[in-house]
Amino acid sequence: MDSLAALYKNHIVTLQERTRDVLTRFKLDALLIHSGELLNVFLDDHAYPFKVNPQFKAWVPVTQVPNCWLLVDGVNKPKLWFYLPVDYWHNVEPLPTTFWTEEVDVIALPKADGIGSQLPAARGNIAYIGPVPERALGLDIPADKINPKGVIDYLHYYRAYKTDYELSCMREAQKTAVNGHQAAHEAFLSGMSEFDINQAYLTATGHRDTDVPYGNIVALNEHASVLHYTKLDHRAPSEIRSFLLDAGAEYNGYAADLTRTWAANSDTDFAHLIKDVNDEQLALISTMKAGTSYVDYHIQFHQRIAKLLRKHQIVTDMSEEAMVENDLTGPFMPHGIGHPLGLQVHDVAGFMQDDTGTHLAAPSKYPYLRCTRVLEPRMVLTIEPGIYFIDSLLNPWREGQFSKHFNWQKIDALKPFGGIRIEDNVVVHENNIENMTRDQKLA
């Protein structure tokens, strides 16, 4: 297998090709990509945790250093000004010398405001890509060249197609996240609180809570019915019934995003429902192939949910087709089947149909689906179906013509378990689907 350095070299070739194309299309000379800046808390001298511009880390795996700049023109070697101040108050990252630095000119930038003297004098035809427009204006970059929509759309669209380097990084992120999931599962079995389970996860992954790509969802019992629950109770409940963990990891700026659900007692209706959701998730993945719309798989899973609602007698005396048609499956799975994954957890361009930014919205019936693209090789997506017992979504169904079809006694018995989500990260290849998560033996 090629080394990471060799993969990165080819990655840069691909990014250079895309850069040439976008510069030609919009008649630009170069892109100036800013890593970003620290942002202080209001009325304070402490900064929020730094989050790098994803368009910057697409080029170089520098994720923790603000005030860095990249100049790329698609022809010459990318030029990186790496912020290297003299500072005895804060840690200063050394000038990098690693697998990727042969492909980039790395130049020390001792002062954050010193970039102006380093750039070409003529900047009227350079596009700024970054989070601080006023910094670009201060560099005499025209306002219409600051994050121009056409350029951003183009860059975002092609980020869906991962290079071999990117896929390698994402597989490494999977390994780290799987280690965390295994440690968290053991902590759950030992009766730990959500807070302590999260600590076990972070220790196993070697991440801080500011390093993970999103806030870990560590949900015991009914907390699993809150889709993005991040509270982390310090005390374990008196009775632990279930555990939903949605937590990822990052490698060289690329994310993993995994979810598993466990029952404390393996011989309960809820435990059997977990197994069935898991089986249906794997069955759905087995049907996936390039050339099919992601929307089709979302709709297909609602049909699978209807089958499970019938099997477990959660909804009765109604055909599976009628359940889907009348959206009785909707309150049980209110989110989409998944989303694109990459430099960002909810990666960009999920709705773009071409590199000019043509937008195809999610179906009105399923407004929270995050991707409407046709699957193509090199795309990476999550597949994360769920079944939840959420009062605010189910209560409106307690009245009306369909109420009699809901087994409210069964639903009320399942509510204390919260809900189920099973999430894998998959790569679309020309003739197969690679399940990066299951390849790491995460059951």
Curated annotation (Swiss-Prot):
Its cofactor is Mn(2+). GO terms for cellular component: cytosol. It catalyses: Xaa-L-Pro dipeptide + H2O = an L-alpha-amino acid + L-proline. PROSITE patterns: PROLINE_PEPTIDASE. Mn(2+) 1 binds at residues 257, 339, 384, 423. SUPFAM superfamilies: Creatinase/aminopeptidase. One of its GO terms (molecular function) is metal ion binding. Mn(2+) 2 binds at residues 246, 257, 423. One of its GO terms (biological process) is proteolysis. This is Xaa-Pro dipeptidase. It holds the Pfam family PepQ_N. Binds 2 manganese ions per subunit. PANTHER family: XAA-PRO AMINOPEPTIDASE 3, XAA-PRO DIPEPTIDASE. Splits dipeptides with a prolyl residue in the C-terminal position. CDD domains: Prolidase (cd01087). The keyword Coiled coil does not apply. It comes from the Bacteria.
